[in-house]
């Protein structure tokens, strides 16, 4: 519980994509990104190493790669505009950076939704020392 409180306090000072990403996951996957994916596998949460453990962890790996390709902007803080129509996310910005970051978040949120059956509680708070092997290229 203390960890969730610390995360909540930290998020109060965060604007832009991370908060929007959380809301997008809630709208699409119907679950909290912070709770379910904040510390999952080898790639969900801060950093990443080794090989993704399952399809859910791979969603985070792909998201990390996508953020790494964002050019001329900080994907974790940029704010973007999106809407949800008929359960589908539509990224609405014309700005290339905002559009790219929104698309990264959209793809990950849909990936989480589509891979809920692969979620394995054994990978929640998975120790980094268990994340072995050469990382795959993005």
Swiss-Prot record:
Single Gene Ontology MF annotation: calcium-dependent phospholipase A2 activity
Cellular component terms per the entry's GO annotation: extracellular region
Binding site residues for Ca(2+): 43, 45, 47, 64
PROSITE patterns to which the protein is assigned, alphabetical: PA2_ASP, PA2_HIS
Cofactor remark from the record: Binds 1 Ca(2+) ion.
Disulfide bonds: 42-131, 44-60, 59-111, 65-138, 66-104, 73-97, 91-102
Protein name, as recorded: Acidic phospholipase A2 Cvv-E6g
InterPro entries recorded: PLipase_A2 (IPR001211), PLipase_A2_Asp_AS (IPR033112), PLipase_A2_dom (IPR016090), PLipase_A2_dom_sf (IPR036444), PLipase_A2_His_AS (IPR033113)
Species name: Crotalus viridis viridis
Enzyme class name: hydrolase
Substrates-to-products reaction catalysed: a 1,2-diacyl-sn-glycero-3-phosphocholine + H2O = a 1-acyl-sn-glycero-3-phosphocholine + a fatty acid + H(+)
Role of this protein: Snake venom phospholipase A2 (PLA2) that shows very low inhibition of ADP-induced platelet aggregation in platelet-rich plasma of human, rabbit and guinea pig. In vivo, shows efficient edema-inducing activities in rat paws. PLA2 catalyzes the calcium-dependent hydrolysis of the 2-acyl groups in 3-sn-phosphoglycerides.
Secreted keyword on record: yes
This protein's record includes keyword Lipid metabolism: yes
